[in-house]
């Protein structure tokens, strides 16, 4: 058996960090088991689904390193769903209902007032053909419900009917079908709700494992019943915890909250996003994995907490810095070249500045410092200006090396009596225009004698 998983986003908005958790969980599970990953667009809602969102999802996944083995669109598979509908109708497992939303709401309130569970009472099963014809003559069109197998022979005498599965994340799970309403699978206009196309596609595409958010736990009992009604063996299920904002609010792709695209545009490294999306809310320590192979080593569905996890952007900042600070030159080289940073000193430059980067784009500033003019003249007081002028008069001749800074500052200390911060800070400001930054012993060599002299105040 080839492990086959799927990520099935609706292209009705941009995917966010919570969706990323699901996509990466499936991708990593398939990767660890030599399996296949299907990207399946749940675009049956023709009105709200947009091609621009589908394209954006593909771009976001590719940026994260997720490359599907197969891409499918549910909007191209309506004929397959229609055949499944007919199969269920023929088996007497899909029945027509004519209630309006208002009528259903009144019935729900009626049951609640009598302390009864607010489940659908299957009143439509009592309709005669003549009554159905009369309702349709009024202009009503039926929606179609799946008859849950929660009875022996009389559908109005429901009984406790447990559906069990061994969840990859949550362990043994049980839901009672008697506590649920028969789900609507087909709307009045003939369009499909999520459930039926999802099950039909999972069967048709050979999906063996479904890994998704724990907001789908209750749905699983219904879906297992539909799998069996269609003559298929249900796949293995795993329900991971959900991510929330730091304040505990749910994430929504329609509001753009923490969208993958916005994180990319903000300059975060894809592996920083992937590492936090996967490791937060688990028993694993949240560390930055340099690549997907390393992240896969820390990925374990059994380590996921059953409680929701809060996504803290400050943790993302820390992971991003960690990745940049440890990034080898060979990995950074193509990106540096794309920014025009190349030549004999590119490697020593990268090794000098990487420990001070929050975003990769910060390298452009430091390249300007070592290769061009300072963006702004350093703000030095009169006393510090005189000190720096004196210090620059003591600059040693080239060639310079890693010891030049030490020998120069020792000479300056002897000549001026300054030491510590009073010595180093004015020199840093004069050389870089910044109060903080990479080690000056490394930068001085990169700046070189002539450029250093040109910065004499």
UniProtKB/Swiss-Prot annotation:
Pfam families for the chain: Anticodon_2, tRNA-synt_1c
Reaction catalysis annotation: tRNA(Glu) + L-glutamate + ATP = L-glutamyl-tRNA(Glu) + AMP + diphosphate
Superkingdom per UniProt: Bacteria
Chief place of localization: cytoplasm
Residue numbers binding ATP: 253
Subcellular location: Cytoplasm
Record's GO cellular component terms: cytoplasm
Annotated EC: 6.1.1.17
Database matches in InterPro entries: aa-tRNA-synth_I_cd-bd, aa-tRNA-synth_I_codon-bd_sub2, aa-tRNA-synth_I_CS, aa_tRNA-synth_I_cd-bd_sf, Glu-tRNA-ligase_bac/mito, Glu/Gln-tRNA-synth, Glu/Gln-tRNA-synth_Ib_cat-dom, GluQ/Sye
Entry keyword Kinase: no
GO function term, MF aspect, one: ATP binding
CDD domains noted in UniProt: GluRS_core
GO biological process, one term: glutamyl-tRNA aminoacylation
Classification via PROSITE patterns: AA_TRNA_LIGASE_I
Short sequence motif named 'KMSKS' region, residue ranges: 250-254
Placement of sequence motif 'HIGH' region: 9-19
UniProt keyword list: Aminoacyl-tRNA synthetase, ATP-binding, Cytoplasm, Ligase, Nucleotide-binding, Protein biosynthesis
Span of the signal peptide: none
This protein's record includes keyword ATP-binding: yes
Function, as annotated: Catalyzes the attachment of glutamate to tRNA(Glu) in a two-step reaction: glutamate is first activated by ATP to form Glu-AMP and then transferred to the acceptor end of tRNA(Glu).
Family: Belongs to the class-I aminoacyl-tRNA synthetase family. Glutamate--tRNA ligase type 1 subfamily.
Assembly mode: Monomer.
Matching PANTHER family: GLUTAMATE--TRNA LIGASE (PTHR43311), GLUTAMATE--TRNA LIGASE, MITOCHONDRIAL-RELATED (PTHR43311:SF2)
Protein name listed in UniProt: Glutamate--tRNA ligase 1
Organism: Brucella abortus (strain 2308)
């Amino acid at each position: 058996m080839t492990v086959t998983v799927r990520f099935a986003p609706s292209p009705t908005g941009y995917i966010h960090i919570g969706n990323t958790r699901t996509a990466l969980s499936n991708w990593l599970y398939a990767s660890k088991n030599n399996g296949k990953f299907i990207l399946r667009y749940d675009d049956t809602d023709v009105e709200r689904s947009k091609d621009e969102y589908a394209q954006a999802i593909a771009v976001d996944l590719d940026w994260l390193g997720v490359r599907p083995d197969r891409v499918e669109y549910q909007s191209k598979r309506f004929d397959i769903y229609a055949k499944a509908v007919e199969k269920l109708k023929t088996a007497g497992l899909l029945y027509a209902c004519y209630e309006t939303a208002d009528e259903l709401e009144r019935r729900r309130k009626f049951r609640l007032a009598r302390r009864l569970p607010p489940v659908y009472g299957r009143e439509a099963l009592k309709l005669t053909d003549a009554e159905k014809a009369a309702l349709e003559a009024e202009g009503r069109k039926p929606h179609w419900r799946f008859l849950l197998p929660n009875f022996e022979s009389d559908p109005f005498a429901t009984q406790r009917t447990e559906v069990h599965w061994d969840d990859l994340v949550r362990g043994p799970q049980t839901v009672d079908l008697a506590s649920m309403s028969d789900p609507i699978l087909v709307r009045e206009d003939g369009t499909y709700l999520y459930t039926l196309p999802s099950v039909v596609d999972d069967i048709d595409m050979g999906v063996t494992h479904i890994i998704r958010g724990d907001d789908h736990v209750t749905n699983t009992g219904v879906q297992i019943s539909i799998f069996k009604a269609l003559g298929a063996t249900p796949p293995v299920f795993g329900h991971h915890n959900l991510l929330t904002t730091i304040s505990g609010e749910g994430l929504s792709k329609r509001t753009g909250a923490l969208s993958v695209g916005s994180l990319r545009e903000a300059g975060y490294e894809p592996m920083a996003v992937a590492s936090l999306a996967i490791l937060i809310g688990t028993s694993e320590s949240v560390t930055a994995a340099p690549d997907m192979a390393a992240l896969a080593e820390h990925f374990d569905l059994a380590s996921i907490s059953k409680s929701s996890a809060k996504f803290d952007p400050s943790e993302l900042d820390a992971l991003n810095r960690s990745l940049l600070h440890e990034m080898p030159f060979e990995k950074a080289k193509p990106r540096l070249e794309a920014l025009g940073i190349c030549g004999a000193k590119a490697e020593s430059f990268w090794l000098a500045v990487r420990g001070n980067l929050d975003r990769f784009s910060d390298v452009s500033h430091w390249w300007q410092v070592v290769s061009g003019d300072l963006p702004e003249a350093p703000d030095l007081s009169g006393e510090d200006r005189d000190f720096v002028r004196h210090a620059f008069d003591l600059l040693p001749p080239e060639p310079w090396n890693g010891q030049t800074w030490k020998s120069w500052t020792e000479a300056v200390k002897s000549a001026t009596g300054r030491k510590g911060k009073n010595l180093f800070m004015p020199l840093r400001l004069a050389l870089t225009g910044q109060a903080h930054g990479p080690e000056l012993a490394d930068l001085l060599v990169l700046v070189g004698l002539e450029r250093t002299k040109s910065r004499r105040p």
